[in-house]
Swiss-Prot record:
DNA-binding region: 74-93
UniProtKB keywords: Activator, DNA-binding, Transcription, Transcription regulation
Name of the molecule in the record: DNA-binding protein Fis
Subunit (UniProt): Homodimer.
Length: 98
């Protein structure tokens, strides 16, 4: 039986410095750094939709990439994402990707 051994550590961001050094760090580190940067720029301004903002920033490229990978096969995409196909269809519609 096939056993999946990929973990969230496989989700990395690769960067190249000005000295052509290549570094990889977990996606979560990049998300955390982006959030810290965003919060620092608020200058005390209230925000009430941060969860939705972050979710949209991650969810839309996730959907786009998975749909390309599965060549538009919604059943396969939903299975890969671990969600119901109906839920996938709603998310695709939300982002105008249907």
């Amino acid at each position: 039986m096939f056993e999946q051994n990929l973990t969230s550590e496989a989700l990395t961001v690769t960067t190249v410095t000005s000295q052509d050094q290549i570094t990889q760090k977990p996606l979560r580190d990049s998300v955390k750094a982006s959030l810290k940067n965003y919060l620092a720029q608020l200058n005390g301004q209230e925000v009430d939709d941060l969860y939705e903002l972050v979710l949209a920033e991650v969810e839309q490229p996730l959907l786009d990439t998975i749909m390309q990978y599965t060549r538009g096969n919604q059943t396969r995409a939903a299975t890969m994402m671990g969600i119901n196909r109906g839920t996938l269809r709603k998310k695709l519609k939300k982002y105008g990707m249907n």
